[in-house]
């Protein structure tokens, strides 16, 4: 269980509209803290679940498979164990193979097509761990061979929201971290 200092709303006290999100998150990760904490701000939780996930991540113009690849690459790079627990099944459900999941940390050498490699390279630029992230001319050429500028904006927005939500989840202590997670708060003074 996470050790967030924020108030949590148990499932029995959640509005009905959030039950599916709680059930899904708890079923995949065993840790529904995100839903329980953000239920205290229902408009924000609705934004995340309905506007971001339903309309943009699972909707939008770009094939969800590319968004799933980017999301998994970011969660692996950021070291979010809770995220990885839900993103691996999401990737598999979107048609990403186990071989691709296993190779996602070395995507240029992995079993990815050129469009997938371009998206993963873009994710590496958006990652919170990359302070020099940039859409170089070379990366833009790789992406634009497969995606319109509107698609690139959609992919970038999806990645930015996912990265930002991961960082917020780390700060609020809503998620478990992998042993290699680079986001570790300083030791509290004695």
Predicted regions located by residue number:
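Helix N-cap / loop-to-helix initiation motif
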Residues: 62-63, 95-98, 148-149
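N-terminal hydrophobic signal/anchor transmembrane helix of membrane proteins
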Residues: 69-86, 153-170
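Acidic/histidine-rich alpha-helical segments that form the ligand environment
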Residues: 116-157
């Amino acid at each position: 269980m996470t050790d967030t200092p924020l108030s949590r709303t148990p499932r029995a006290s959640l509005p009905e509209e959030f039950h599916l999100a709680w059930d899904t998150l708890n079923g995949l990760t065993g840790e529904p803290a995100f839903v329980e904490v953000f239920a205290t701000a229902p408009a924000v939780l609705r934004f995340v679940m309905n506007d971001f996930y339903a309309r943009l991540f699972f909707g939008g113009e770009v094939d969800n498979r590319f968004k799933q690849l980017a999301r998994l690459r970011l969660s692996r790079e950021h070291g979010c164990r809770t995220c990885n627990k839900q993103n691996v099944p999401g990737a598999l459900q979107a048609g990403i193979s186990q071989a691709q999941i296993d190779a996602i940390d070395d995507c240029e050498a992995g079993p990815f097509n050129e469009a997938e490699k371009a998206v993963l390279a873009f994710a590496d630029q958006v990652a919170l761990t990359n302070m020099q992230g940039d859409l170089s001319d070379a990366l833009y050429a790789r992406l634009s061979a497969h995606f319109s500028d509107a698609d690139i904006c959609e992919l970038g927005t999806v990645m930015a929201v996912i990265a930002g939500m991961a960082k917020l989840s780390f700060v609020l202590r809503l998620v478990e971290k992998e042993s290699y997670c680079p986001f570790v708060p300083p030791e509290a003074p004695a």
